[in-house]
Amino acid sequence: MDSLHCLETLLLGFFVLLPCFFYFVWKKPNNKIKEPPQPAGAWPIIGHLHLLARGDLPHKILSSFADKNGPVFKIQLGVHQALVVNNSEIAKECFTTNDRFFLNRPSGVAAKIMGYNYVMLGVAPYGPYWRDMRKIIMLEFLSNRRLQSLKHVWHSEISISSKELYKLWETQNIDFCLVDMKQWLADLTLNMSVKMVVGKRFFGSASASACEETESSNCPKTLRNMFRLMGSFVLSDYLPYLRWLDLGGHEKEMKRTVKELDILFKGWLDEHKRKRLSGGKEDDDQDFMDVMLSILEESKLGNDVDTINKTACLAIILGGADTTWATLTWALSLLLNNPNALKKAQDELDLHVGRDRNVDESDLVKLTYIDAIIKETLRLYPPGPLLGPRVVTEDCTIAGYHVRAGTRLIVNAWKIQRDPLVWSQPHEYQPERFLERDVDMKGQHFELIPFGSGRRACPAISLALQVLPLTLAHILHGFELRTPNQNKVDMTETPGIVHAKATPLEVLVAPRISPKCFV
């Protein structure tokens, strides 16, 4: 009976509040104001949410809306309006002329819980704290000087992982050994990110010692849970009055995961503090957590310094590992499905590097086809097909339309980068298009913005553009690659914050360079 009474009360409250909801959220706009078009099919209360849950991926559904409604339109996501941009010129307008209006991220359950109450840089509101933290990360982790000092980390990880792959082939004593390259790349990129940030390695023969075995097994699982949860759909982000129900159990799982992460990062932080007290490290040997300890000694950032350190390190690991892994997995998948492109890449490596030594960073400037492969991969499979959402802070005008404060901005990079008005045969894999077309990926050429643009663009663009070609070149140079039975690679995608391949990437692998390169 108590449950029935509670239900009656909820229903009464619902019908009392429903007219208010329609008045404030669905009221007709001023006829003098030109507003963006809106796709048909919105329902009361939930808006267009049901259309985004029809089985296809959100960026593809929004692309189909653009085909019918034009390159810019608005949709209703529960209590929130969103402006969806599907055109490079309009994206340019958002990220240049009007960038000052799009500097905030939307609030949400994941941002609050897993972002340590919005302390993490990627979800922090725009203001003095965000500006100061971004400056610290850019200077102390992503500056040319710091990247130069960190190069040995990714060189070492690529070398170690390649040697382990060679040993696997050697141990099996067969022409080709079968490897899930998706998992291999996930292990490599997570090792790389964690090593740069906290000096740890978790996979392979050179990983943690026996006393760290539990930590070594728990860390990857917990971090990948966080990757998944940060990109999960939480209904209460769009219908806040349902949060108390925790439909789907996301909030409970987020709290459990962030608690596990906090224990992990606190242990690392305490370890770094102990080493610091016992004499510390030379500047060139310091990882990012060491650097942050020094900087935060005299911090005036307005938050608990340990929380700032943990969230800064977590943000870099999250931002680096999964996006790099996903891009490299797509790059290999596309090459395996296009053997002529794979042969061209390996011929280029043989010409400029040979088969008696490993690829060096100094070789990359000559490897123009490898560079074109990276660009074409990021064009077809951007790490985040929908760029990180933003919130309009003031009323503004975009593409001639009035956009109200509080509206969310969704930029469909996937659609922009397949625009037939910009790209010939936009859905075809053609790395050659970038041999004659001078386009960079740093956010200034708006037809190719896989890392975003404006002040909220991914700060680690420079790091990604060094690690991606070097890693891919090492793999293609070091190993012959083919699919079992010459089958096509399954290119099914997963939903989520990172645009990842849904299925394993099973590849037959054999060395193609001198064995001395793996010693």
Curated annotation (Swiss-Prot):
Matching entries from Pfam families are given as: p450 (PF00067)
Show the InterPro entries listed in the entry.
Cyt_P450, Cyt_P450_CS, Cyt_P450_E_grp-I, Cyt_P450_sf, Plant_Cytochrome_P450_Monoox
Positions bound to heme:
C458
Q: Where does the UniProt entry say this protein principally localizes? A: membrane
**Into which family does the record put it?**
Belongs to the cytochrome P450 family.
What EC number(s) is this enzyme filed under? 1.14.14.132
Gene3D superfamilies tied to this protein: Cytochrome P450
Q: What reactions does this protein catalyze?
A: (-)-4'-desmethyl-deoxypodophyllotoxin + reduced [NADPH--hemoprotein reductase] + O2 = 4'-demethylepipodophyllotoxin + oxidized [NADPH--hemoprotein reductase] + H2O + H(+)
What does UniProt give as GO cellular component? membrane
Q: In which pathway does it act?
A: Aromatic compound metabolism; phenylpropanoid biosynthesis
Chain segments annotated as transmembrane? 6-26
Q: In which tissues is it expressed?
A: Rhizome-specific expression.
GO MF terms held by the record: heme binding; iron ion binding; monooxygenase activity; oxidoreductase activity, acting on paired donors, with incorporation or reduction of molecular oxygen
Subcellular localization(s) per the UniProt record: Membrane
Name under which the protein is recorded:
Demethylepipodophyllotoxin synthase
* Gene (name only): CYP82D61
Topology within the bilayer: Single-pass membrane protein
Practical applications: Combinatorially expression of Sinopodophyllum hexandrum (mayapple) genes of the podophyllotoxin pathway (e.g. DIR, PLR, SDH, CYP719A23, OMT3, CYP71CU1, OMT1, 2-ODD, CYP71BE54 and CYP82D61) in Nicotiana benthamiana (tobacco) results in the production of the chemotherapeutic compound etoposide.
Q: What does this protein do?
A: Cytochrome P450 involved in the biosynthesis of etoposide, a chemotherapeutic compound of the topoisomerase inhibitor family. Catalyzes the hydroxylation of deoxypodophyllotoxin to form epipodophyllotoxin.
Q: Which cofactor does it need?
A: heme
Keyword annotations for this protein, in alphabetical order, are: Heme, Iron, Membrane, Metal-binding, Monooxygenase, Oxidoreductase, Transmembrane, Transmembrane helix
